[in-house]
Amino acid sequence: MLSPVNVSIESLNLMTLVPMLIPIIGALFIIVIDLFKSEQDKSLYVMLSLLILGVDFVALVDSAGVFANNGTIMGVFDMMLIDGLAILSQFIIVGASMLFIPLALTHKRFHEFSYPEFFALFLFMIAGFQFMVSTDNLILIFVGLETASLALYTLIAMHNRDKSFEAAVKYFTMGALAAGFFSFGSMVFYALTGSVEINQIATVLTANNYADIGFVLVGVVFLLAAFGFKLSMVPFHTWTPDVYEGSSAALAGYMSIVPKIAAFIVAMRLFEFLIHSGVVWLEVILYMGVVVTMTMANIWALVQSDVKRMLAYSSISHAGFVMAAILIGTTQSNSALFLYWILFSFTNLGSFSMLWISRQKNLPAHQQSDHSYDKFAGMVKTSPVAASIMALFMLSLAGIPPFALFWGKMYLMSSAITGGYTVLALIMALNSAIAGYYYLKLIVYMFMKDPVVENNGHVYSANATLPLKTIIGIAAIGTIFAFVAVNQLIEFVTLFVYNSGY
């Protein structure tokens, strides 16, 4: 006869679920409102979503205080793991989401924002990403990954452009393949160690001195491929330009930030112990992936004729940059990862939001792209403020001081040198120089060429709604004045990373 199992509510520590339950309950609340009052103005759903995210942010602040006083918090049969990595990444996820949602207050022709399902799916997606970063259990990571991914596929398809459904299908196909790779890699590690918890997997493999190195490499390759799809690492990046092009510019900017920080955290938890295992092949595989991703993405970005696709390849290169922090594997590099991505979030979301200002409802028959370089030619004459702000974001992405990403790149390359990866730091510097060309190319078009279409100015002014101006203004202020807070930000991030044992 089986003995009874006694589980106390205190041992479950259900408070660890609060940051995830808030967006889930909020999404269900929006659906219920729509059931009873289906003709509500979309601004109600925007305000509700912002309120829900604000409450979620407050809950994260409370979790940060508990972590600062008590250290890592475990809950729900030790499946939930609330440490510094989880808290910092959730701040980025929720913060970027709060910057994205007001963009829904735009013209009615972007009809996906008129549906309450859009906001409910968006909140479910956020909860999925929060689960991903708040556990070291491979099963729960997979559940969070699929929850977020399925919602994101639908959000892409809801955009009312011809390429949106194609983009959603491509993303779904690649996502399904990534899910298969993740499942197989997890299965290999479970077969080797009898556990699906990353901490236990590390303990067992270390105790066995990596005796089954062949199977370990198989598991690593499959998991790296899964992360490669989610992080757009070469050669798993092929979906990225097409999906970004088929999505709205704002959603593309959001996709370049939030899904990737979730994947970065899972990769950091998993590869941190593998890189320090002393098995040189594990390090070599990741090293090659980082260098190839940074370099090839920059080369492809150089030859793009569409600004949106250029920014898509640029995002791939930046993801390779940040993966270098995981390869280096020191507290300084892991702190640099968060610093870099926080600063990148302001700059890249601002860049894609500027593309949204230049959007057109109906493209001319001869025009295949809504964001060709020619469209930005002479922008300083038709809309000088828009040209100046776009130039600001391009200079930051290029790493030009004193703008935001300069500090992220410097701190990351410094961590590479300190960690003994001097050659990698040189490769990163070289790639930054290459990237500078295609960022400055757009600035040249805006400031040194004559307008191809003389009346483009009315397009910018018509599209620049107050919410869009506000978000771009916040992004621009963060990009310009990052140097004021960068030292305090490094100290804050390092404290949380160090106290998490990374």
From Swiss-Prot:
What one GO molecular function would you report for this record? NADH:ubiquinone reductase (non-electrogenic) activity
Transmembrane annotation, as ranges: 16-36, 47-67, 85-105, 113-133, 138-158, 172-192, 213-233, 248-268, 273-293, 310-330, 337-357, 387-407, 410-430, 470-490
- Which Cys residues form disulphide pairs? none
Q: Which residues form the signal peptide?
A: none
**What keywords are assigned to this protein?**
Cell inner membrane, Cell membrane, Membrane, NAD, Quinone, Translocase, Transmembrane, Transmembrane helix, Transport, Ubiquinone
Q: According to Swiss-Prot or TrEMBL, what is its membrane topology?
A: Multi-pass membrane protein
**Cellular component per GO?**
plasma membrane
| Enzyme Commission code(s) on record | 7.1.1.-
Q: Which reaction does it catalyse?
A: a quinone + NADH + 5 H(+)(in) = a quinol + NAD(+) + 4 H(+)(out)
Record's family? Belongs to the complex I subunit 2 family.
User: Subunit structure, briefly?
Assistant: NDH-1 is composed of 14 different subunits. Subunits NuoA, H, J, K, L, M, N constitute the membrane sector of the complex.
The protein depicted here goes by the name NADH-quinone oxidoreductase subunit N
**What organism does the UniProt record list as the source?**
Sulfurimonas denitrificans (strain ATCC 33889 / DSM 1251)
State which gene encodes it: nuoN
